Amino acid sequence: SFKGGYLASGNYYLTEDITLASIIQINAGSDVKICLNGKSINTEDVTGYDYTIRNYGTLTLNNCDTANGIINTYSFTFLCYNNSVLYGNAAIYSPMEVKGRSKISGCTLNNHITCSANSEITGGTFLDRTYIHNSAVISGGTFNQEVKVFDSGVITGGYFSKAISSYNGNFIKGGYFKTKPDDSYIADGYAITASGNSNYPYKVVALHTCNGVTYDKPLDSSFKGGYLASGNYYLTEDI
């Protein structure tokens, strides 16, 4: 019987597939958790709306039956705006726009995503193209298709299977890469080095210079000991 509307803070779960007749909206300050429970939210019947799911608050989309159930909104865009946050493990099949200092920290996106206006991707799996611009940041997540960076977008972390493309240089400050990034994309004070990860053999790290020697192999608290190959290492925290 649920066909759309405003969702107040709370923990919701689907008991059957839903086809929306109007938008779903989560207002600023609301904390909404939805478990798809192996069911789908469809939007084929929604007309007259550019965005059919609008998140202005904190939205967690989970699915305890990942073999079934998706956000099935192929023809309409999922909007995250105005300091909103998206978490979860659900599969989303709509294009997504992320604006206004919002954050994507989970879910699997099967369509393209555009991230702008000081927003950030910190996690999630991205199976189609990703576009970042207007001071947007990628600091985490797994990207299986091309990532395009415009104007002031920045990459500080994440795992990238395909090539990065950009009209501007000096924007990569971290991350793991299957394909070696173009040297012109690496920010000043950073370098491409071997990652030790066979799936993502290249990583970008900050350089450290001391007494005229440049160090390009950071060690953090995850290092607990072992054999060290030839190289210049520096500590980023106590070990």
Show the residue positions of the predicted features.
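Extracellular/surface-exposed low-complexity segments
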Residues: 1-7, 140-141, 157-158, 162-165, ...
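Tight coil/turn sites that cap or link beta-strands
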Residues: 10, 17, 29-31, 37, ...
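N-terminal extracellular ligand-recognition/capping segment immediately after the signal peptide
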Residues: 10-32, 36-45, 90, 143, ...
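Extracellular beta-strand-rich solenoid/capping regions of secreted or surface-exposed proteins
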Residues: 19-33, 42-62, 72-82, 95-98, ...
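Periodic glycine anchor positions in long extracellular repeat architectures
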Residues: 29, 57, 84, 102, ...
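Beta-strand-rich solenoid/repeat architectures in extracellular/passenger domains
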Residues: 38-48, 62-74, 83-94, 105-111, ...
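Low-complexity, polar/charged sequence tracts that form flexible coils or short amphipathic helices
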Residues: 53-54, 77-79, 95-99, 113-116, ...
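Intrinsically disordered, low-complexity linker/propeptide segments enriched in Ser/Thr/Gly/Pro
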Residues: 86-92, 124, 219-221, 226-239
